[in-house]
């Protein structure tokens, strides 16, 4: 069967400007959250990615009027109806689990297919389920393909998350906005996307305090009204372009960026020796090789993001000595290692840590096993001698708006082909 591939002829310097998209990890939660509104919602600054289109079509399955126009989405929930959500759409992206919290909050019941997304090893939703149960939901998991959630009523509860989880923190917030009384989420995730979702819910009239700290308090309200809301910039897309610019950038200017959100990456790139200039809403990057070797350990925000350990890895082949990358969040997130080895990289991974040594990369045929592995392979392709062909690019399009066009505009020799 024919499929699209991305091809890159490496070695071209990057120069120019890129406008960073709205945050994927905010958008995929805020779109489901619109169904909690009574009336009309307008979202601005959405990333133009396939995950957004899938979630909009899930809203339409609930008889919600949704008009997606580029970066803008208008939603009218006046005619909303509860309906089972089909497995074929839900399984294509993991963030469809936010429909559970939103539908539970709105209807006190839902039937939804089991979520999909990138295969990153064990990513259970047990913390989400724990939260829903604490709020009064009964959960039927007897089907292999779907899950049924029902609550006679939702009541506020004190929920302590066993592990810090962005998804569970947001999903419990969505379910709790209409619950009677106060819900407290302790050991809550502090990521900017959690704050963004809370700000959106508050723009509709929700009573939420403490988002961005480890303890979030939600006082249930009867009704949420419509609103207009602008989504924050995508710190992971920004970080990925920062890594590409550090690899091959003569001078790359990134606009629509919140420097504080990429601070952990910025500090690590400066340790490597990258020339970085920071302004209010933009960052300028210039390549300054050879780089110094560094060690990286992923942590929850504000630590080094797990989503950026793959995109930064190709830079570590350009250093003077060995580097170590440890992923404490997803220790199985090293499927890119085998693909980099095909390109001649001296890299090995074991039990959540990769050992990376200076290497010359050569173009090869490689496979994007997940979204951020795809960004890693693009960066590797920009550095490599010869042509790199990346297969399974659907993962890349799930998270990066027009990435081929953006890189082409910066001077990369990059194109798509159908094979």
Swiss-Prot record:
UDP-N-acetyl-alpha-D-glucosamine binds at residues 94, 123-127, 307, 329. Cell wall formation. Adds enolpyruvyl to UDP-N-acetylglucosamine. One of its GO terms (cellular component) is cytoplasm. One of its GO terms (biological process) is cell division. The gene is murA2. The keyword Lyase does not apply. It is found in: Cytoplasm. Pathway: Cell wall biogenesis; peptidoglycan biosynthesis. This is UDP-N-acetylglucosamine 1-carboxyvinyltransferase 2. One of its GO terms (molecular function) is UDP-N-acetylglucosamine 1-carboxyvinyltransferase activity. It catalyses: phosphoenolpyruvate + UDP-N-acetyl-alpha-D-glucosamine = UDP-N-acetyl-3-O-(1-carboxyvinyl)-alpha-D-glucosamine + phosphate.
């Amino acid at each position: 069967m024919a499929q699209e591939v991305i091809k890159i002829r490496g070695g071209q310097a990057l120069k120019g400007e890129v406008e960073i998209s709205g945050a994927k990890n905010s958008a995929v939660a805020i779109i489901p959250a619109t169904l909690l509104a009574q009336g009309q919602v307008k979202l601005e600054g959405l990333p133009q990615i396939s995950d957004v289109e899938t979630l909009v079509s899930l809203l339409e399955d609930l008889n919600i009027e949704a008009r997606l126009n580029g970066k803008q989405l208008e939603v009218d929930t006046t005619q909303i109806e509860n309906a089972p959500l089909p497995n074929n759409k839900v399984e294509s992206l993991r963030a469809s689990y936010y429909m559970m919290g939103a539908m539970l909050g709105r209807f006190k019941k839902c039937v939804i297919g089991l979520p999909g997304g990138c295969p990153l090893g064990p990513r259970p939703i047990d913390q989400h389920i724990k939260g829903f149960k604490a709020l009064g939901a009964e959960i039927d998991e007897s089907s292999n393909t779907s899950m049924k959630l029902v609550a006679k009523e939702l009541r506020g509860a004190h929920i302590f998350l066993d592990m810090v989880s962005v998804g569970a923190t947001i999903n419990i917030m969505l379910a709790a906005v209409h619950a009677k009384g106060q819900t407290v989420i302790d050991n809550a995730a502090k990521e900017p996307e959690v704050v963004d979702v809370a700000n959106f819910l508050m723009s509709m009239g929700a009573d939420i305090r403490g988002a961005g700290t480890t303890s979030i308090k939600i006082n249930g309200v009867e009704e949420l009204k419509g609103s207009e809301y602008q989504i924050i910039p995508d710190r992971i897309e920004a970080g990925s372009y920062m890594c590409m610019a550090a690899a091959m950038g003569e001078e790359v200017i990134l606009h629509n960026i919140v420097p504080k959100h990429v601070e952990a990456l910025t500090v690590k790139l400066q340790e490597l020796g990258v020339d970085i200039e920071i302004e209010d809403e933009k960052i300028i990057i210039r390549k300054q090789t050879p780089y110094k070797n560094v060690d990286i350990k992923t942590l929850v925000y504000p630590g080094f993001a797990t989503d950026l350990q793959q995109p930064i890895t190709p830079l570590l082949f350009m250093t003077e000595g060995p580097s170590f990358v440890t992923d404490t969040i997803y220790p199985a997130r090293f499927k890119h290692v085998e693909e980099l080895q095909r390109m001649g990289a001296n890299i090995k991974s074991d039990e959540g840590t990769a050992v990376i040594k200076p290497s010359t990369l050569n173009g090869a045929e490689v496979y994007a096993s997940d979204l951020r592995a795809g960004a890693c392979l693009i960066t590797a392709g920009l550095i490599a001698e010869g042509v790199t062909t990346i297969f399974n690019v659907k993962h890349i399009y799930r998270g990066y708006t027009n990435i081929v066009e953006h890189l082409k505009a910066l001077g990369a020799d990059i194109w798509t082909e159908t094979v």
